[in-house]
């Protein structure tokens, strides 16, 4: 705020005022006028000072959370889960998974990953929620505590069709409601380290710290020393043809988490206002679905190696898998019937129709 004191008219000083308003105060000593040039922004600051909106304070509180410390806390427990899984200590794995899922740090991180970090956060499920305010995120972190999970049917997923990259075809996505996505993210944080300790080294799809470039490098390292025949296979409808009961048995997790995953798998699909039950597969679009598909396909390399004919046992074949794309590398051609018979035993959790492998 600036003050101009003297016997000047308002018209005389107005050209020098770039912003704000002019107010005059008549003084008692001879009528000398003091003209005040008041900045409007200063007035707004004064008027709003101490009157901060609740949403602003919640946003500040959310952003000021010690996220690095929370992530480190989760990572420490995940490392313990990984080591216990490596040693085959199932009871310790389940105890640590429960500890992680009940911790406030993991619940806050799970909500943040779904509502803030995830690229698909703006895609709504049937609940219609596209964005979540900071105060609602705190409430979600409290709601997804495992002790508050209700063991009843979940809301169905919303069917969305998106184009396949480089193709004219479209693939379906099943988008769960926002709160279910947060629960799935929390469950994934617990299950992922357990299964990372079990997964085959040549599996690269939907795994932390791995990419398609790593899969290409693995194939190159295999074929550069010796010539190899490469069989390119694509498991069609891998998400849609997973046998849910076999998958649940393969997970071998504790009852509460098993029931939650069973509810998500059988939530059903809502498309164009019509409900369809899901008796097979896992929705492609759920937070936990890629991990469940990797669990279903786990053991494929071992099954193919064991099913390899003894007449070709000079050098066992190698398998490089990225999600449902498989590269089978071998030093000789295997008869088609033998390959087909080995593929039928690749995974006990997949029920593939004839001609879909």
Task: State the predicted function of each range.
Residues 1-140:
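Non-catalytic, polymerase-adjacent accessory regions of viral genome-replication enzymes
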Residues 62-65, 69, 171-179, 183, ...:
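Conserved aromatic-histidine-acidic binding/catalytic patches
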Residues 75, 79, 91-94, 98, ...:
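Non-catalytic, well-ordered alpha-helical scaffold segments
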Residues 100, 166, 177-179, 208, ...:
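Short, flexible loop/turn elements at secondary-structure junctions
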Residues 121, 126-170, 181-189:
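A contiguous, low-structure linker/loop signature
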Residues 146-148, 154, 173-203, 212, ...:
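Duplex nucleic acid-engaging cores and interfaces of nucleic-acid transaction enzymes
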Residues 156, 198-202, 206-344, 349-357:
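Conserved polymerase palm-domain catalytic core
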